[in-house]
């Protein structure tokens, strides 16, 4: 199985399975001298780890990260950073009934058809458990970004659960960390709690929309055509489990606008060019404008539900299946820190590419 690595100069390779002894990431390309500690990385992993409330899977994993290489006396050395997270709460017996069956909506059938072998215990490599390694790697990227671009801030949040969206008029950055859904709308969080609790008790699930905003992004990240910043951001988000659609800025809604409505008009401000709006999501021609970079994606409902469904076995015989085990009723909740991590990795990668090509700062002066 190939394609376990992403990135150009800042490269991340993840490894491990849901029910294996451990999983982790090898991070190559982190600049030397970046302050990195296990404690600092753990902050981000704690945001993602399961079992923290009734709205996420009750699998109890400490998700304690171990730095095995690439860091000396609290600083990166420039060599590959090996990160490991041991699995502690596997319950493989829950999956014995599906060893010969394919779960609808999961990667079971495509993995089997492509490779002729699959780890049915929790999905193996296709499990969202793999994203713990991404969050650890994202912590490294955040540390490097913090050293290179101190004012850059990456924040993910949920804007929709099932058919229920937030009220943008109530958007409050301070609310995001105050509820289990990472939403900026406190009233929506209360409504979603009752809604999701009902689905959880019924053994069902629901999808969600997640938005990630990076504030303080320098001008000039990305390149035309095949190295667009939005190309890599879209690919990064689409690689997250259960993601089925990605938008940049106004996204699909831009198709219903006129040219006048969609135009981000440009004015000269005291510190340089300013824009009347941000329909472009902070990226023009694949290159960052200095505005907020805004990415949005949709995740499908968790496929592991307690409803009896029709499927087939490896031999092609019809069968019924109920997915046992411990699962998230809304994977969008824990997708938030994963999306933040992927955004951090892509932005650092493009910052390093930009500095390597043109040096620090934009080349074309205005004013």
From Swiss-Prot:
Pathway: Metabolic intermediate biosynthesis; chorismate biosynthesis; chorismate from D-erythrose 4-phosphate and phosphoenolpyruvate: step 7/7. NADP(+) binds at residue 48. FMN binds at residues 125-127, 241-242, 285, 300-304, 326. InterPro entries: Chorismate_synth, Chorismate_synth_AroC_sf, Chorismate_synthase_CS. Pfam families: Chorismate_synt (PF01264). It is an enzyme of class 4 (lyase). GO terms for biological process: amino acid biosynthetic process; aromatic amino acid family biosynthetic process; chorismate biosynthetic process. Its EC number is 4.2.3.5. Homotetramer. This is Chorismate synthase. The gene is aroC.
